[in-house]
A protein has these predicted regions:
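Short helix-capping segments at alpha-helix termini
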Residues: 12-17, 43-46
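EAL-family c-di-GMP phosphodiesterase catalytic domain
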Residues: 1, 19-34, 46-158
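Conserved functional hotspot residues or short segments at active or partner-binding sites
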Residues: 39
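A short, hydrophobic coiled-coil helix within the histidine kinase transmitter core
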Residues: 6-10
């Protein structure tokens, strides 16, 4: 069964449902642009949004970006790494962040491993980040434990 039909059949009816963001790799978009556009339109009708993953590592063009209703542009980690000290990587990151914002989308930096890179990306206006510096990959049980710990730490004492 196609993903759009699965979501339509099983999604909550609540107006408070936050939806889902599906990541599509840039290479996949380029190879099957027509198909991805059709699926993106079906998903959008069910509260599902698209994030373009690994942006900059593939062969996308402005016409590719123009034709997709994406909400996140995820910068490939190869550009994020050492963007605080590498002028070329910094220029690419800044350009991608600006591009995301011009499309009214969020810029997400992948592979943040140093505090210097995090600071540089923050100054550039990057909206979100992910990587080992922020939180390493972890099993579901550890993630749920981390959420519980953060939730209990944020509650005021009675």
């Amino acid at each position: 069964m196609p993903l759009a039909q699965v979501i339509e059949r099983h999604r909550p009816e609540s107006e408070r449902w936050p939806g889902i963001i599906v990541e599509v790799c840039e290479d996949q978009i380029v190879r099957e642009l027509g198909r991805v556009r059709g699926i993106a339109q079906q998903l959008h009708g069910n509260g599902i949004q698209i994030a373009i993953d690994d942006f900059g590592a593939g062969y996308s063009s402005f016409s590719t970006l123009r034709g997709l209703p994406f909400v996140e542009l995820k910068l490939d980690s190869s550009f994020v790494k050492e963007c605080a000290v590498d002028a070329t990587n910094a220029a690419i990151c800044q350009t991608a962040i600006d591009l995301a914002h011009r499309f009214n989308s969020a810029a997400v930096a992948k592979g943040i491993e140093s505090a210097a890179d995090l600071q540089a990306l923050t100054v550039m206006g990057c909206d979100f980040g992910q990587g080992d510096l922020i939180a390493p990959a972890m099993p579901q049980e550890r993630f749920l434990e981390l959420l519980r710990h953060r939730a209990s730490a944020s509650k005021p004492a009675a």
